[in-house]
């Protein structure tokens, strides 16, 4: 079998990977004409089956849950199928293909040990004569803030303060020195192409042009560009709504119909409430920046061949949740008038209100009012609204 060069894009998460993958998918034919092939058997956009291939049997996630892969035997069959499919796909490539592109941000979040990355190396080694690991890294607090929106879309029941606790140098998800070392230990430092996720440092101030430069491809009119933003964050209001729905209806519920409805609702929120979400306070930013300063400087020195701080010190604007009446009216208009919801969603809003009534009556009132917009004649809904109005006087 002809061996080729492999470009392995490992993320990291929250560094425009969805936009890159959409570009690669939409330009498959143009890339083939230039001798590059974007792997499809492991996932048509996100090649997620490959990082999942290297995960331990005792660790599961949404990838396996969605596919009902629950036992060690089912994992074994999944690995056999993934390996066979990849082999068939690469074996069938014409000789004109000199380079293979693989992309998944889940290499960053799911393959967190050197031994897991070694599994990836062993899987790919029959197919490459050379390999280049492409990795974008983003300042830790920005990563956290963007990740929080993704976690809400995925069903987290924990608020921002909970996830903030994990943003420490002990966590290889955020500690890029530790994370990159695992890849170096398996592939060698010279195989890594580490880029700072910062528009000011991109080639032509453009992420796609920058990524193409990593592939040693000149930007050209041969490629179509995806103009619609991909995988945007939720604004604070969308985050509050999404979190409340998740808390009322956690993913572990056995009622699949309710979970399906919840996902549809989260999708509506995603489409209508894009924007900058909550961020750390200036004090939290300063503490986190200092905690990562030395490891970030080492990454800057080792991989970017530069001295000083990896990221500029830039305190965020404190973007905390502030729900006012105008925002609620906007929510009602967008979620119900602009995108009509089926009557069953009144139950979701009603139960979200009941969840909040003992701890935050104003939020309970907001969600019960949403339920009334969908089901104006609901007896329990109207009774509760009257109770809330009396208590809020």
Identify the role of each PLM range.
Residues 348, 380-381:
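TPR alpha-solenoid repeat register
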Residues 355, 387-392:
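TPR/TPR-like alpha-solenoid repeats
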Residues 1-360:
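Anion-recognition interface
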Residues 370-371:
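Canonical positions in the second alpha-helix
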């Amino acid at each position: 079998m002809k061996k080729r060069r492999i470009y392995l894009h490992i993320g990291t998460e929250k560094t425009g990977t969805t936009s890159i993958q959409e570009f690669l998918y939409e330009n498959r034919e143009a890339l083939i004409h230039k001798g590059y092939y974007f792997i499809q058997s492991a996932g048509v956009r996100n090649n997620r089956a490959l990082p999942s291939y290297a995960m331990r049997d005792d660790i599961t996630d949404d990838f396996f849950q969605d596919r009902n892969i629950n036992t060690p035997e089912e994992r074994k069959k999944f690995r056999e199928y993934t390996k066979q499919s990849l082999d068939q796909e690469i074996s069938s490539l014409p000789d004109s293909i000199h380079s293979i592109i693989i992309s998944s941000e889940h290499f960053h979040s799911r393959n967190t040990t050197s031994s897991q990355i070694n599994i990836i190396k062993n899987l790919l080694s029959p197919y490459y004569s050379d390999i280049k690991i492409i990795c974008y890294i983003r300042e830790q607090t920005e990563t956290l803030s963007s990740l929080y929106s993704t976690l809400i879309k995925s069903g987290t029941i924990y608020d921002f303060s909970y996830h903030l606790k994990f943003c420490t140098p002990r966590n290889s998800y955020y500690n890029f020195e530790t994370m990159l070392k695992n890849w170096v230990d398996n592939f060698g430092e010279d195989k890594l192409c580490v880029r700072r996720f910062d528009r000011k440092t991109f080639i032509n101030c453009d992420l796609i042009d920058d990524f193409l430069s990593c592939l040693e491809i000149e930007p050209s009119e041969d490629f179509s560009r995806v103009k619609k933003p991909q995988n945007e964050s939720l604004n604070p209001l969308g985050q509050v709504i999404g979190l409340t729905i998740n808390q009322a209806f956690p993913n572990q519920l056995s009622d699949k119909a309710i979970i399906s409805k919840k996902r549809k609702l989260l999708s509506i929120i995603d489409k209508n409430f894009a924007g900058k979400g909550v961020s750390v306070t200036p004090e939290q930013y300063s503490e986190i920046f200092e905690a990562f300063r030395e490891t970030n400087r080492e990454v800057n020195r080792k991989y970017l061949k530069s001295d000083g701080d990896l990221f500029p010190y830039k305190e965020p604007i404190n973007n905390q949740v502030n729900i006012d009446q105008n925002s609620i009216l906007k929510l009602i208009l967008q979620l119900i008038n602009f995108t009509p919801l089926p009557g069953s969603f009144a139950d979701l809003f009603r139960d979200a209100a009941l969840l909040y009534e003992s701890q935050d009556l104003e939020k309970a009132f907001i969600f019960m009012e949403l339920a009334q917009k969908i089901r104006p004649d609901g007896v329990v809904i109207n009774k509760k609204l009257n109770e809330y109005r009396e208590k809020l006087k």
